[in-house]
Amino acid sequence: MWYTSTRGMAPRVNFEGALFSGYAPDGGLYMPEELPRLDEETLRHWSTLSYRSLVKELCALFIGLELIPRHDLNDLIDRAFSRFRHRNVVHLCKLKNGLNILELWHGVTYAFKDLSLSCTAQFLQYFLEKKKKHVTIVVGTSGDTGSAAIESVQGSKNVDIIVLLPKGHCSKIQELQMTTVLKENVHVFEVEGNSDELDEPIKAVFADVAFVQRHNVMSLNSINWSRVLVQMAHHFFAYFQCTPSLDTHPLPTVEVVVPTGAGGNLAAGCIAQKMGLPICLVVAVNRNDIIHRTVQKGDFSLCEVLRTTLASAMDIQVPYNMERIFWLLSGSDSQTTRALMEQFERTQSLQLPKDLHNKLSEAVTSESVTDEAITQTMARCWEENQYLLCPHSATAVNYHYQQTDSGQSSIRCCLASASAVKFPEAVQAAGLTPETPAEILALEHKETRCIPMRRGDDWTQMLRVTIEGLSQRWKDCVVNPSE
C-alpha cells in the first residue's frame, strides 16, 4: 500500500513514511493511492467481529505485511487497547426512542482520541525500536488530542512530545490532564491564543522540510494518516452494531452522526463510505460552522472570530482534514486540491467548484448547534434516560432529537466523542450534577508544569529551539549512554 500527498507534488511513501510525517513536503496530507473495495460478503463477515478484531482487519488492509507482519500487528493493537476501562473497548448504548450512542471514550483520558492514538503510538514504538531512532512529536490541541497523545507516549525513552494548548480555551480537567504529567519526555506549552492560532507555528515548522528531517519531527494530530485509519473502525462498528440485518440486498443504510472539529473522524467516515460501507454521514458542529457552511453552500471560508463554546474541543475554524475529503471526492485530483487549498491559505476564503460541492453534499449532511441547544439536549437526554452527555456528543444527539421530533425514523448512530466527566462546567450549565471519578478529582492536587507562549513572543522560534534542544539531548545520550 502506497500513500500519496493530496497536493501531488511529493514522493509517494509507504505506511511507515506516512506514519512518521506531519504534513507532506508539499504541504498536503497523505492518503492511500487506492482504496480497497469491500464486497457484501466481507462486510457480513466483519459484522461478526469485535471492535478490537475490526481494527486489526482494517489496519491489515493499509499496512504492508512486509512492514508489520500480521502477528506483530495483532499484538500491537492488543497492547494499545489493554488499558481501556471497557472490556469491549467501545460500547453501544441503546436508549429510548431509537437513540443509539456509540461510546468511544473508555480510554485513559476519557476521549475518543485514545483509540487512534494508543494504536499509533504502538506502531511508532515498533519502528523506533527496530531502527534505534528518536522522534520529536509536535501536537496542537483544542482539548482532547493533547492529553491522549501525552498518555500514549509518556515515559518513552526514544520519543519526546511537545504539546501546544490554548490558554483559557480548554476545560480545567482537559488542561490538568496535560500539565500534571511531569515525565521528562513531555513538554507542554500554554499558548495565549486559540487552537487555530497555535496551529500556525506548527505548520511553519513542518514547512521547513530540511529542519523536520534533520530533527525527526512528526505530528500526532489527525493530519497523521494512522489516526484516520484507526478511526475508520468507528464507522464500521457503528454500522454493524445498529443495522438490524445484513441478509438483505442491497444492505440497509445507517446514519452516522459525527461531532466534528478538525474533521479527522469525518474523513475516516468518507473513506469508509468510499470502500463500500452503506452509511449516510451527518456532521455536527458547534457555532464554529465552517464545515456546515461548506456542506450547505460550498463556502469554505473563515469567520472573523473564533467563537468560544461549551463544546470547546470543536472550537476550530480550520478543519484541515477537509483537504482529504476534497481530494477523495474530486476523484484523487491533486491539481484541483492543491489549487483550492493554496487559495484558502492565501485568502482564507474559498467557494467550492459546483461539481465538488454537489459531491460533498451527496456524501454528507450537516448541522450547526448553539450552546443553548447543547444544554437543552444534555438536559433532555438526562431526563429521558438518566444518561449524561458531554457537550460535544450532545451536538450529535441534538440532530437525532430534531429528526425524531419531526417524524424521521432512520436507523441512526450518534458517536460520543468524550465522557461528560471531562466537562463539569457544561454539565452544570445544563442544570445537571457532574459525576467526577476519583482519578479526575485527584488532578486538582497534583503538581503542574507548562511553559507560557505569550502574545508578542516568536512562537515558531520557541518551537524550533525546543526541538533543537531535544534533538541534541538525544544525540548526547547516544554518544554518552551512561550519562
From Swiss-Prot:
Pfam family, one: PALP
Molecular function GO labels: lyase activity; phosphatase activity; pyridoxal phosphate binding; serine binding
Listed cofactors: pyridoxal 5'-phosphate
Top-level lineage group: Eukaryota
Disulphide bridges, residue numbers: none
Entry-annotated residues carrying N6-(pyridoxal phosphate)lysine: K113
Ribosomal protein in keyword set: no
EC class: lyase
Keyword Transmembrane helix applies: no
Cross-referenced CDD domains: Thr-synth_2 (cd01560)
Keywords: Lyase, Pyridoxal phosphate
EC code: 4.2.3.-
Family membership noted in the UniProt record: Belongs to the threonine synthase family.
Role summary: Acts as a catabolic phospho-lyase on both gamma- and beta-phosphorylated substrates. Degrades O-phospho-threonine (PThr) to alpha-ketobutyrate, ammonia and phosphate. Also degrades O-phospho-homoserine (PHS), but this is not its physiological substrate.
Record's protein name: Threonine synthase-like 2
Gene name linked to the record: Thnsl2
